Amino acid sequence: VGIGFLLHELGHKFAAQRYGCFAEFRSFDNMLILAIAMSFFGFVFAAPGAVMISGRINRKKNGIISAAGPAVNILLALAFLALAFANPPPNIFKLVASYGFIINSWLALFNMMPFWLFDGYKIWKWNKFAYSIIVGMAFVLVFGGNFAR
């Protein structure tokens, strides 16, 4: 989860910097504490912070910067899927790759929720077609990817 989260946030940071914006990670300590507490009950989800962007930014740039995070998770999921297929069971690499696939697929789909603070909200406001494509890809990976296990 941590690697998927980190690379997701770095995707936002590098996309923002490409547009000449200042981007830095800010931690949300309360969310980290909540994530740790929830892990004791079997629910593992961590959003201990986010990349904050400042600079001249319009709706299109914000949408593209927001799309970079889920796009990174989709690419990671596809890479892990390829690794899972390249390693026949029983194999620890197949197991790790399968979990990497599942985690990154869910991270992409979860972040595409069209609600305030989520990437999906900013992408939806910018371009509904782009939103639909990214959600569609993440949906297919999450619900069509059972064969990776």
What positions do the PLM features span?
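Hydrophobic transmembrane alpha-helices and their immediate loop junctions
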Residues: 1-149
